[in-house]
Amino acid sequence: MFLGGTISTPPASLRLRSTLNPQNAVTQSSSQATFPAAMQRKPPSYSISDEDLESRGFLLRRTTEGLNLDQLNSVFAAVGFPRRDTAKIEVALQHTDALLWVEYEKTRRPVAFARATGDGVFNAIIWDVVVDPSFQSCGLGKAVMERLIEDLQVKGICNIALYSEPRVLGFYRPLGFVSDPDGIKGMVFIRKQRNKK
């Protein structure tokens, strides 16, 4: 699925540095940058405010600091993802351009998670969108996705895609994702299994 909208590239001055890749960061002093009112971004409007989430005991995190990979792996398994090698999860997170996870304050455990990879300029793919089954239907998935999409757009990312199982397409559509926009089809390489003789 692809995030619907116009494909365009914002000026480099609007791109923010990545919180996960500081060695690639480009910063600009706010005193150097002035933008016409039409170019200034409005504050994001989320379905659940950060304050409301916090009042309910949910803490938003945008870095891997404090993220227990064994606990995250348990959330993956609880939603039906295969259990993963935590060393490989760590490598995947090192190559992640943006992420957002929710920590439940009472248990200090991750209860929702999503991440994105991409080229840092034009394209990103969202991966691993999960919400612990005990915390589903309270808006955490939507809260994570709204903020991750906003984080990518603020960086100037124009094309945002994700892979989705058919049963959850209805979750992504209200967020702006469309299947097969303008006839575009996603394709996946599948390694052929060798016949054992």
Swiss-Prot record:
- Read off the InterPro entries from this record: Acyl_CoA_acyltransferase, GNAT_dom, NSI-like
Q: Where is the N-acetyltransferase domain?
A: 58-195
Keyword Plastid in record: yes
Q: Report the principal subcellular site.
A: plastid
Q: Which Pfam families match?
A: Acetyltransf_1 (PF00583)
> Composition bias, kind Polar residues: at what positions?
23-34
Recorded GO MF terms: aralkylamine N-acetyltransferase activity; N-acetyltransferase activity
Q: How is it modified after translation?
A: Autoacetylated.
This chain belongs to which protein, by name? GCN5-related N-acetyltransferase 1, chloroplastic
Give the lineage: Eukaryota, Viridiplantae, Streptophyta, Embryophyta, Tracheophyta
